Amino acid sequence: DRSHRPKTCPNRTDERIETRVIELRNQYGWGADKLKVLLAREGIEVPRITINRIIQRNGLLIEEYCSKPALKRFEKERPNEMWQVDLKGCMGRGTARCEPLSILDDHSRFLVGLFPTRTSKLLPIQAAFQETFENYGIPDTLLMDHGVPWWGNAHVSGLSRLSVWLMKQDIRLKFSGYNHPQTQGKVERFHGTLARSVRHKGTPTCFEKWSPLLATIRQEYNHIRPHESLNMDVPASRYLLSSRRYNPAPKPPEYPSHSTVIKVDHLGRFRYRGLRLFASEALADELIRIEELERTAVIFYRNTPIREVSLVTGQSSQFVLSQES
């Protein structure tokens, strides 16, 4: 008897397309939505459901790569208006331990910096920022948490030497609220992507291998990986260099002529209205500006409000900014 089975299956995906889906999945580890965009860039139109079936059929569906859709969050209107900054925390073990430093543009999601670090001490972190500033310019604002190295736990005021160095570039610093990681939602979400990428590509076995790995991940994230929040575009398509250039020898602050300007002593203290007040040890010998608000005064260093002081009791506290995400 002759078989009635058709010689070809009209619903079977072209083998070349299936092979390409598998190649892209193995290369990046991304889901069907992103792979669909990559294929379209190559002139291959494949339905999302078909890509998912190929992934499942070839045993490539790994639950850890499935992510929840991004929440709609606050977004700055232009590049370099604000960068979000964070240390990922320990990745790897032993001599391969690494704490990646991430610097992300809020508007475009462009990753201006991704550096392997072993320590949160001043010099290596400052060098990473300086390299970023020399490559991309200076942002208006940096958003960060209350962690070391930008938040100096050794100082009553919380300011660190790194914070002061950053402010000398006339960058306004904004610190997220305590226990509010969602304030830095974009860089926190990137850290989830980073962790998945490292697992997919393989965790380095020595510290020296982190640098090329992070460079590859950064290149893919900025120029290849489609972003849902950007209508499946890439961050590089929306990012522009800052017009503000890095100044290796910044001048002293220039405050408005009507301002009350005081020099902080070598212990971070100053006198105002008969009160001995504290600014920050990290601001020793620097010029600060005082702005009165009824019974309190706000201390500014350059364009960043750093502390709020009671003119009745002399007690001071960190200046609290409204939360943004």
Briefly describe each language-model feature range:
Residues 1-91, 160-163, 234-243:
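Basic, flexible linker segments flanking DNA-binding modules
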Residues 45, 49, 55-111, 118-140, ...:
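Mobile-element integrase/transposase regions
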Residues 112-113, 307:
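A structural microfeature
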Residues 133-156, 177-179, 184, 231-235:
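Acidic/histidine-rich, metal-coordinating catalytic segments
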Residues 162-247, 295-297:
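Charged alpha-helix within mobile-element recombinases
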Residues 220-325:
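C-terminal, beta-rich DNA-binding module of retroviral/retroelements integrases
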